[in-house]
Structure formats: structure tokens, C-alpha cells
Amino acid sequence: MAVPKRKMSRSNTRARRAKWKATAPHLAKTVENGRVTYSLPHQAKVVTDSAGTALFLEYKGRKVADV
């Protein structure tokens, strides 16, 4: 296992850790019944009725699970 020869300075440590930041997920825009919704691609979305009650999960136009 590699062992550092010298102590790493605080500024170098923080500069290295600054690259660890997370990226925002890319959202897919879909329009249904005149409503625009944004969701994660390749993930099932919740289908709701007019009252907003969750009915089931849908992926690529198919029902995949009950809620």
C-alpha cells in the first residue's frame, strides 16, 4: 500500500475534495393531458387519478407495479 512521504496541506486536501461534488440528475420532460412533468429517465413513474391519488407505477407505457 502506498504511503505519502509528506503531510498533505489543508489547501491541497480541500482542492482535491472539491472535485468530489455530485452532479444534478438529468430530467426528462413529458407532457400528459396538457400538464408538463419532469421525471428521471429509465425509472418508473407514478400514475395518478384526477384527485391526485396514486394508482400504479408505469414504465414505457406499461403498468409495472401497484402502489
Curated annotation (Swiss-Prot):
Coiled coil: none annotated. GO terms for biological process: translation. Residues 1-20 have a biased composition (Basic residues). GO terms for cellular component: large ribosomal subunit. One of its GO terms (molecular function) is structural constituent of ribosome. The keyword Ribonucleoprotein applies. InterPro entries: Ribosomal_bL32, Ribosomal_zn-bd. Residues 1-24 are annotated as: Disordered. Keywords: Ribonucleoprotein, Ribosomal protein. It comes from the Bacteria. Belongs to the bacterial ribosomal protein bL32 family. This is Large ribosomal subunit protein bL32. It comes from Renibacterium salmoninarum (strain ATCC 33209 / DSM 20767 / JCM 11484 / NBRC 15589 / NCIMB 2235). The lineage of its organism: Bacteria, Bacillati, Actinomycetota, Actinomycetes, Micrococcales.
